[in-house]
Amino acid sequence: MAGLALLGPIENLLLASTITQLHHRLESVKFLPDAQAPGHDPLNYGVVTAEAVALPEIAAPHRNRTYCLTVTSKPDLPGEPSLWSAAVDALAAGSDIGRSRNGIELLGPPDPSAARLIVVSAGNVDDYTDDYRQTCDLSPIEDPGQAWNVLTVGASTQLTDPPSDPSFVGWQVLGEDGDISPHSRTGMIAGGERWPIKPDICMEGGNVLADQHGDFEPSHPLLSLRTTHIRDDSALGSANATSAAAAQAARLAAMAMARYPSYWPETVRGLMTHSAEWTPKMRSEIRVESGLKKRRRLLTRFGWGIPDERQLLSSSGNAVTMVVQDEFVPFTGDTYRMRNFRLHQLPWPREALLDLGAADVELRVTLSYFIEPSAGRRGWRNRYAYASHGLRFDLQRPNETTSEFTRRVNREAAVNEDGGASGSSAANWTVGPEQRDKGSLHQDIWSGDGPELAATGGVLAVHAVGGWWKNNNRKDRIGLPIRYALLVSLRTRAEDVDLYTPIATSLAVPIEAAPVEV
């Protein structure tokens, strides 16, 4: 996995005649005890993780890092917070932690300058069956992959060429091209719809061979990823499943950090899902489902797809991404009474959109931030009792003034906090607000034509909803700013349209909105 995290799959590099320039390095920490030593107490997994995270930071405190965690365990309650996932959430948010009888102990408020991007594997299935999809869907993501603040990585596969080895005559490749890997767990049965959609993305995890007698070969080199050998630096080996997928995702995240050194961990996490694409196989299933809840269920199998390295590291003429990093105080007043907003004027070229006519256009929006988990396990089964706060985004409707927009957003936020359904329109969105507003990474895709998009006001709101900070009236959290990354991209399949140039000449300036009383 070290080779995958550093180089990615190595075949193309071996065939290339050019020198590969690396812009990131590896660090490693021994996480598991020796085979002869007693294992860690599961109640201490969070503390052990915190100690492992601290070691490289002490040695070299000023490096930007991506943490890759591929050690997982069976969840007690799939999808719901655990001591381990809460500890990982706290570490990602920049909180120091200890352990108490009732859960984790937060040793102070989160420090945004200490925030961390943690990549976690979704975990691997226990057994293989011919109906690999059902097996994957009935195998819930392992702990701590359900953590809100991490980037959870499942495995897909495009390795479908059967081996020519005579010993495998009659064997068939199990997974279809572009489908979920037979190795991967999913979030299909993850505790209902209160919790985040997981996994967030997929990466190549290899395939499995099956014969007619119910036997399976899960690790054939041709259906795995070629990489450096686990023990011999001069030899090649192979890796597969969700650990290999997570290592590749960590590599992409590290490359993004090197390419954009000013980006926060929250931003890079958002960029990973924002640049992800579904394979034709995945897309055919997502698009055929008309119900938003059904689409959400498919997301719990594939996430947002496979990150595109080119899109991750650059924009093109007909696909351009705007990245905003901002912070604000979500609530003010002694009782968190005043809700605050950020409004962003989107710099899309109205004329270019109108010129598109009936041509398809996509507006992709990603909102990424980190929550502070509640220290005590009591109330964790309520998502508003687990997270310190939440953020939401909403797009101004056609013919809606800015003041009407802010009043509507505030009204719907209050209803949402009370457990009511969001009044935001789901029209044209892939999953809609009811499905996307879970966790701390919110993404959705608006699809339509250029004139439809041009008719909106071009203003996007980011607003807060309450969590345990507000519910518990925590005086020591009043006035704390929270930060977020907002990524917005316009894409069109029209080849003769240049969206990049007119957008690049314009800047998105946040409009300060007055606080609105809750």
PLM segments and residue spans:
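Hard-cation-handling environments
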Residues: 248, 265-266, 274-278, 282, ...
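Long mid-to-C-terminal assembly/interaction modules of large eukaryotic proteins
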Residues: 360-518
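Active-site core segment of subtilase-fold serine proteases
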Residues: 1-4, 8, 14-35, 61-66, ...
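Catalytic-core environment of secreted peptidases
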Residues: 1, 156-174, 178-246
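Short, small-residue alpha-helix embedded
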Residues: 2, 245-259
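Subtilisin-like serine protease catalytic core
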Residues: 1-44, 62-67, 79, 112-115, ...
